[in-house]
Amino acid sequence: MADPRDLQLSAYDYELPEARIAQRPVEPRHAAKLLMVPPLEASSLQGRHGTVWDWQNELRSGDLLVVNDTRVLQARLRVRRSGGGLGELLVLEPRGEGRWLCLARPGKKLRPGDQVWLEALEQDPLPLQVLASDPASGGRIVQFPPAFVDAMAIEALLQRYGEVPLPPYITCHDDSDQERYQTRYASRPGAVAAPTAGLHLSDDLLQAIRARGVQMSSVTLHVGLGTFRPVETEDLSELSLHSEWVEVSTQLVEAVQACRQRGGRVIAVGTTSVRALEGAAAAGGGDLQPLKGPVDLVIQPGYQFRVVDGLLTNFHLPKSSLLLLVSALIGRERLLDLYALAIANDYRFYSYGDAMWIAPGAVLMDARPR
């Protein structure tokens, strides 16, 4: 019987000591701690503790690992305001004719009609015009000069002068973030945040996984503005979520079909891979089909998965859509108990934090693909 609390946002809250928010990644990547969720039939919720390197022992020959190959844009530009103060623009998406939707900081001091200059170009500053506010996002529409009408020109500008946009809860920055806040297989620029479960996969671990006969394939989901937005709808039966651009290729669909035929399991690396796979299946009427376009799928308790059997994931923020997604796999109360266990055992949370492994045997019976 469904628990009515599963549809209340307040039921997905938990308290996290500030010291448990990871400020820097561990080295090597695969040295992060790993909490392995016990199977449904287990007599306790204690779980097993290891490292992400140990995760290879949980995988089987014939399994299919699906990763998200998006690459984080160096989308944060430092600007100087007309009064001399500094600000930031997080460049998000094109709005045509050299106009781009940006998140602005400080928002109250970057208003429509203001002009700012790219801070990195001290000798020949590049003027940018704040045209309008965007009520849907809380951002600003910013006009770039004519030389930057083309998206490729903007990408080149960001690559040269931009910075990786780390989440606001990471306050310790250094030059290594440019490499460390990307997965090793990131190849398709377009995200403003990393698919963080993939940050744990080192070259050595990927090689070891392939050596076990595990197949690998990729989807693309460009993590967008919504990743910075908290869920605000208390009644989750009325929840709608931001859309994110997804590409699921014919080759990926064929790889999933081949995995099923050989008796393998589809293992998603990260919630973004889950959303891409399940979104493509939903668009296909329940069957996984190639897809290129936006996905706004809501995954929360009561959802029956169509593609994904298991998940490697990080520990997520309270009341977030990602927490709802993981709860759909293993149950809300069970998830919160496991989070309490992780906190008690000094696991590190969020983007640069540790990981959780949800094996197919740990997934709720009603949620499993049929």
Swiss-Prot record:
Subcellular location, record wording: Cytoplasm
UniProt gene name: queA
Catalytic activity, EC: 2.4.99.17
Pfam families named in the record: Queuosine_synth
tRNA-binding recorded as keyword: no
InterPro entries noted in UniProt: QueA, QueA_dom1, QueA_dom2, QueA_sf
SUPFAM superfamilies: QueA-like
Keywords: Cytoplasm, Queuosine biosynthesis, S-adenosyl-L-methionine, Transferase
Name under which the protein is recorded: S-adenosylmethionine:tRNA ribosyltransferase-isomerase
Gene3D superfamilies the UniProt entry points to: QueA-like
Similarity-based family: Belongs to the QueA family.
Main subcellular localisation: cytoplasm
GO BP terms in the entry: queuosine biosynthetic process; tRNA wobble guanine modification
